[in-house]
């Protein structure tokens, strides 16, 4: 009975978001707008592109953070981190490499056809490229489902034969959804077809409005896999540190997921990683640009404090 009620409610919520041709041309869904980071003639978001032949000094002293966005988002989600670091001379030795997840950043057909394994491929590709170039200090910063992708790699032994990353920063890791309708959506996916999430006109250029049921199935599979890995427990590579920050009032990722991370993802010596809940109502609280919600001074202060904490730890 409860499941039936959930499916009825889901059906009421999941309808295709339609608009005229002019509107769709201004959406990421429509195929006319791509993630800028996919075109190196516009901007070189990957450090492997912007500094393809690092000097000996850069290989030894530059700290590269590979920034990984979340499900249905784009590289824009991490744009404020390098912008902030660029204003602070003390962080001049940090560079941010913003990847675009596989299947993301182009039209809706690419998004619909990609698996979660496809989503994650650019993460390790950039890591391997930077390592081969000789960069010695590489870390990760991930948001939401990007955290789940990285935790899947970590738990699967992907770094057993690779140099260990120095830091793993997880912002609002998506392990348990706050919206318990997700499981019902997956069950009813063939009937319902789509889960639209329309934002402001500017947000729609950087986030998919329509979220096809195929992509929700992939997201659900990824979260279940990572949840199971955390319940079983796994350890980070030797030398890798982790910092996890989770919003207390997140409408997308259940804060209980932070407890799973705390219990299940341990350092190489089996000690706990640094996990803290922060007082925020925002999902992906380090992204403030283009928000439709009214932002407060506390939101800005939390973003800056988190950026500084990440940068200070990387440079230690």
Regions found by a protein language model. Name each.
Residues 169-180:
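Active-site nucleophile loop of the alpha/beta-hydrolase fold
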Residues 51-59, 210-282, 302-308:
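Serine-hydrolase catalytic core
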Residues 38-102:
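Short, surface-exposed "cap/lid" segments of acyl-processing enzymes
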């Amino acid at each position: 009975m409860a499941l039936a009620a959930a499916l009825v409610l889901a059906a009421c919520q999941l309808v295709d978001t339609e608009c005229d041709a002019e509107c769709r041309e201004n959406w990421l869904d429509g195929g006319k707008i791509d993630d800028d980071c996919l075109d190196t003639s516009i901007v070189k978001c990957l450090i492997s592109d912007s500094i393809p032949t690092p000097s000996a000094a850069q290989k030894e002293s530059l700290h590269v953070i590979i920034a990984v966005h979340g499900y249905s988002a784009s590289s824009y989600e991490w744009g404020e981190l390098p912008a902030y670091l660029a204003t602070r001379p003390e962080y001049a030795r940090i560079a941010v490499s913003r990847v675009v997840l596989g299947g993301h950043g182009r039209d809706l057909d690419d998004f619909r056809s990609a698996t979660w394994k496809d989503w994650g491929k650019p993460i390790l590709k950039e890591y391997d490229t930077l390592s081969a170039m000789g960069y010695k200090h590489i870390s990760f910063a991930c948001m939401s489902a990007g955290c789940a992708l990285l935790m899947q790699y970590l738990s699967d032994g992907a770094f057993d034969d690779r140099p260990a990353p120095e830091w793993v920063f997880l912002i609002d890791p998506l392990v348990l959804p706050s919206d318990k309708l997700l499981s019902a959506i997956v069950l009813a996916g063939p009937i319902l077809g789509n889960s639209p999430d329309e934002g402001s006109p500017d947000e729609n250029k950087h986030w998919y409005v329509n979220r096809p049921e195929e992509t929700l199935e992939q997201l659900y599979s990824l979260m279940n896999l990572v949840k199971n890995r955390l319940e079983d427990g796994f350890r980070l590579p030797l030398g890798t540190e982790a910092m996890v920050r989770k919003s207390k009032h997140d409408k997308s990722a259940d804060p209980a997921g932070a407890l799973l991370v705390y219990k299940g993802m341990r350092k190489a010596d089996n000690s706990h990683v640094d996990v803290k809940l922060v007082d925020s109502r925002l999902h992906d609280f380090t992204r403030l640009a283009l928000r439709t919600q009214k932002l407060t001074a506390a939101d800005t202060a939390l973003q800056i404090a988190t950026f500084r904490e990440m940068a200070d730890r990387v440079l230690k």
